[in-house]
């Protein structure tokens, strides 16, 4: 950082940092537009429909048309609502969803803030996301949004515990909380990815990591309020939950924040278990030109994110919604004991194993 400031000056360094953040945000939002289209196309295909196919070739511009539709609608604040909190809630959700991405590396060196405690920062920021939903549900001054907000708070807190323990198992193996180092540890081919790796300890690593990857993926569905765990916005019970009273741009901000969190969970699944930017073949690209090698890394990272987003979309289309008691039972009585046992097992292996 000191060298960076000495080279460009304080204001020059600040300007470059702002440009990097803006470029990253623009790429992320454009990618999100096409992922939204994919989500709708997958759902339509499962239901034997065509899906969006009018705006642009094959409906490719549908998300951009929806963006302008939301932006140019009137913002209607319900009578009796707390106006300032009502408008602040979607902003909180969106900002927290964006800043969480600051520590996610898309390729070696392609990260806004390469923190040594990146996992801790990410977990802290994602945990704060529930505040936007709670504030929005309470400020709307309506029973359906309030019930949806209460459900969301209980659901996100319940599954954050399991996600936290699963992340601890990965940290014990990696010996680092830096996301780039966790990815680099998995280089050299798919047989070194955490989910498939043997590694030198008393039992094959994949025997623990495969169940942890499955539980992490299911917990990510609950953490992001996606089907079959979309109880906070259940249409058949709460109309649309905490979003009932929102329209126009505030509703758009909620939706973008929600999908940014979904893509983040896809990225975390790829980073923690499936090698991040590492390709499955173990190809050595260190001798390639800088742009070519980093484009190769970025391609594989993006491909893994798209694959897991596709899995999110398929679950949404195929799996019926859980009841609230089933949701809580799954989180507290099944996932929590399994993830806690995995932490104890991996901790014992790290301390008392051949490498301990």
Swiss-Prot record:
Top-level taxon of the source organism: Bacteria
Entry keyword set: Cell inner membrane, Cell membrane, Membrane, NAD, Quinone, Translocase, Transmembrane, Transmembrane helix, Ubiquinone
Membrane topology summary: Multi-pass membrane protein
GO cellular component, one term: plasma membrane
GO MF terms held by the record: NADH dehydrogenase activity; oxidoreductase activity, acting on NAD(P)H, quinone or similar compound as acceptor; quinone binding
EC number from the UniProt entry: 7.1.1.-
Catalytically driven reaction(s): a quinone + NADH + 5 H(+)(in) = a quinol + NAD(+) + 4 H(+)(out)
Subcellular location(s) of the protein: Cell inner membrane
Ranges annotated as spanning the membrane: 16-36, 52-72, 85-105, 117-137, 163-183, 201-221, 254-274, 295-315, 334-354
Biological processes annotated in GO: aerobic respiration
Family according to the record: Belongs to the complex I subunit 1 family.
Subunit structure: NDH-1 is composed of 14 different subunits. Subunits NuoA, H, J, K, L, M, N constitute the membrane sector of the complex.
Protein task: NDH-1 shuttles electrons from NADH, via FMN and iron-sulfur (Fe-S) centers, to quinones in the respiratory chain. The immediate electron acceptor for the enzyme in this species is believed to be ubiquinone. Couples the redox reaction to proton translocation (for every two electrons transferred, four hydrogen ions are translocated across the cytoplasmic membrane), and thus conserves the redox energy in a proton gradient. This subunit may bind ubiquinone.
Protein name, as recorded: NADH-quinone oxidoreductase subunit H
């Amino acid at each position: 950082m000191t060298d960076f400031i000495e080279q460009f000056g304080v204001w020059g360094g600040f300007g470059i940092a702002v440009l990097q953040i803006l470029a990253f945000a623009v790429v992320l939002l454009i990618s999100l537009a096409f992922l939204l289209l994919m989500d709708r196309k997958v759902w339509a295909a499962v239901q034997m429909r065509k899906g969006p196919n009018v705006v642009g070739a094959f409906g490719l511009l549908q998300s951009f048309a929806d963006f302008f539709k939301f932006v140019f609608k009137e913002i209607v604040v319900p009578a009796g609502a707390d106006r300032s909190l009502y408008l602040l809630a979607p902003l909180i959700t969106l900002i927290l969803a964006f800043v969480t991405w600051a520590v996610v590396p898309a390729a070696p060196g392609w990260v806004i803030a390469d923190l040594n405690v990146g996992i801790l920062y990410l977990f802290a920021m994602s945990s704060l996301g529930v505040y936007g939903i709670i504030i929005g549900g309470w400020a709307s001054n309506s029973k359906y949004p309030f019930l949806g907000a209460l459900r969301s708070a209980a659901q996100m807190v319940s599954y954050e515990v399991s996600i936290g323990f699963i992340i601890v198992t990965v940290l014990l193996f990696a010996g680092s909380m830096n996301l780039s180092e966790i990815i680099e540890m998995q280089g050299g081919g798919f047989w070194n990815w955490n989910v498939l790796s043997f590694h030198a300890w008393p039992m094959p690593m994949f025997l623990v990591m495969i169940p942890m990857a499955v539980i992490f993926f299911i917990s990510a569905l609950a953490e992001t309020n996606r089907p079959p765990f979309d109880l906070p916005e259940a249409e058949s019970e709460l109309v649309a939950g905490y979003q009932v009273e929102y329209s126009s741009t505030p509703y758009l901000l909620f939706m973008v924040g929600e999908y940014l969190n979904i893509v983040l969970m896809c990225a975390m699944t790829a980073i923690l278990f499936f090698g991040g930017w590492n390709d499955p073949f173990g190809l050595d690209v260190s001798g390639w030109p800088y742009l070519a090698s980093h484009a190769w890394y970025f391609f594989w990272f993006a491909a893994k994110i798209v694959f897991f987003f596709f899995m999110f979309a398929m679950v949404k289309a195929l799996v019926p919604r859980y009841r609230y008691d089933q949701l809580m039972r799954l989180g507290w009585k099944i996932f929590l004991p399994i993830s806690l046992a995995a932490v104890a097992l991996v901790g014992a292996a790290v301390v008392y194993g051949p490498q301990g």
